[in-house]
Amino acid sequence: MRLIPLHNVDQVAKWSARYIVDRINQFQPTEARPFVLGLPTGGTPLKTYEALIELYKAGEVSFKHVVTFNMDEYVGLPKEHPESYHSFMYKNFFDHVDIQEKNINILNGNTEDHDAECQRYEEKIKSYGKIHLFMGGVGVDGHIAFNEPASSLSSRTRIKTLTEDTLIANSRFFDNDVNKVPKYALTIGVGTLLDAEEVMILVTGYNKAQALQAAVEGSINHLWTVTALQMHRRAIIVCDEPATQELKVKTVKYFTELEASAIRSVK
């Protein structure tokens, strides 16, 4: 596992956006051979999306031959709802770049058969071979996507009941009313994420420090689903200084020295 300990949120955004752009450009995608990118929602990746849009506008990358798969979507929330993840992605990213509509994949939380929708999503991913790079965030309790604590570390895309902690955390998007937050979501599984060729997780803020400590220094544990990254061959965690507060000093020192060139690449 790589850990890139940066100073602040802006550096995390710039570094992660540049990493994605470099991966796309190295791949040299075409219509017949697209680059497949996994994407998250939430507050953490917002600045990364802003940085990606800036790089696109500067002519440094095209998303025309990039296929995207989002991590999750609420059940029962119309696509047009301002807090649906469909709305989030178009507002904060898709509407600002040259991605083709046909290449955008987001789970549909309004079908009559959720299991069939989840199976369809898995098969759609497999039809492209694999996801080349999956970017994600992490919850305060260490969850990735909506794989809440005690999720199977080999799980696939499925419907999940959201925990009280997640409902409370997400209520800030629903007028701070926990009763307005959907109780269920469709989400990729931990196993689905681990199938990606490369996984990059963004961790920012003091409130994510325990999750980062579990991911880097803890043992693999289904109560902290982020720890599953330890089993991945090409996992990267990009974090800011506040998120490292629970890590041992020698751990931060080790990765700071190991990733010195990567850290110097962003200002």
Swiss-Prot record:
GO biological process: carbohydrate metabolic process; glucosamine catabolic process; N-acetylglucosamine catabolic process; N-acetylneuraminate catabolic process
Activation and inhibition: Allosterically activated by N-acetylglucosamine 6-phosphate (GlcNAc6P).
This protein's GO CC annotations: cytoplasm
The protein's Enzyme Commission number: 3.5.99.6
Gene3D superfamilies: 3.40.50.1360
HAMAP family: GlcN6P_deamin
Protein name: Glucosamine-6-phosphate deaminase
Naturally occurring in which organism (per UniProt): Pasteurella multocida (strain Pm70)
Name of the coding gene: nagB
